[in-house]
């Protein structure tokens, strides 16, 4: 946007903080960051034990100030888990740059966790896949100490139907569905070695297996909220069967019978 002459200044906030925590401004901004912490708000980055870490080290974003809520209405349990000794534990992961700029990297509850314990925030990958591929509406990644990362995909069936028509295949047939799945695989391979977006993300966190969801993500099934943001734990819950299938020998091939059926 800045290249086009449209200034866009990123910030960060929560409803629990009324809501602004940090922001860039025209006089001082740093691309990729959420800017400087609003005064007189206090902010620190803490590790899993609640100990403050050094600048540049990632951890949970923790804040304190008069703008922080006193608690959740009639929900003492949630309040106790969020506010401790006057500090609000946001549940967001990030770090502070040397100049004090805040960088937000994702939600702790959404972290991918590999079998060796390494962790990674999936949001950037998921957003890039959906934004850069016209054939994918949603991508939700999963790895909970698993041998590889799985991807749950909501395809753009309108775009894929047009794609198979251009290749003179009749939409709805098994062959057309397999052609759609092959195209989706090609889109995902663009993020791997030799692809258009090679190096954008570490390959171990890219989806090694893909499941096509049998229905869209909607507010009705609870998988997205009122602002169309993915409710990750609900996606895992609603589509548990599809997710488990991806860790079977049959599920490793994107053109498996289950995916083929869900493409119709």
Q: Predicted regions: what is each one?
A:
Residues 39, 98, 226:
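A cytosolic small-molecule/anion-sensing beta-strand core signal
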Residues 13, 35, 92:
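Active-site glycine-centered loops adjacent to acidic/histidine catalytic or metal-binding residues
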Residues 1-29, 134:
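Gly/Ser/Thr-rich phosphate-binding loop
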Residues 44-56, 60-114, 255-263:
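Conserved ATP-binding/catalytic segment of the ANL
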Residues 36-40, 88:
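Short coil-to-beta-strand transition motifs
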Residues 138-142, 147, 190-264:
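Conserved C-terminal "lid"/linker of ANL adenylate-forming enzymes
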Residues 65, 70-71, 93-205, 216, ...:
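AMP-binding/adenylate-forming catalytic core of the ANL superfamily
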